[in-house]
C-alpha cells in the first residue's frame, strides 16, 4: 500500500490543524490576591526583583495595563475598572484605524471581553459581547 501525495498532504494539514488548535487554546482565571474578580496576566519577565511594586506598575503601564502588583508568583498586570460603569479607557487608541472591531481585538488581548469606541478613545468593558 503506497502513500499518495494527496493522503500525505491531508495527513500533514490535519496534524498541523490539531497541533495549532491545542497550542492556541488560552485559559484565563482570576489571579490570586485580587478581590474584585478581575482577570490579570502574569508575564515571564519579573520586574519585581529589582523595582518592586513601582517597577511592576511601570512595566504593566508600558504593556497598556492600568496597574501592576507584585505577588509571590511575580508581577501581575491588571486592567482596573471603574466601579460605576465597569469600563476602562486606555492611552493607546486602536479606534483610529480599526474602529470598534480594532478596539474589541485590543481589549481581548487585555483579557477583557469587549471594546467600544467613544469620543475619548477605546474603552474596554467586561461582560457579554
From Swiss-Prot:
Where in the cell?
Secreted
Q: Name one GO biological process term.
A: killing of cells of another organism
Which pairs are disulfide-linked? 40-78, 48-70, 56-75, 60-77, 87-125, 95-117, 103-122, 107-124
Q: Which UniProt keywords apply?
A: Antimicrobial, Disulfide bond, Fungicide, Plant defense, Secreted, Signal
Organism name? Arabidopsis thaliana (Mouse-ear cress)
Cleavable signal peptide: 1-24
Of the GO CC terms on this record, one is: extracellular region
Annotated family:
Belongs to the DEFL family.
Protein name as catalogued: Defensin-like protein 200
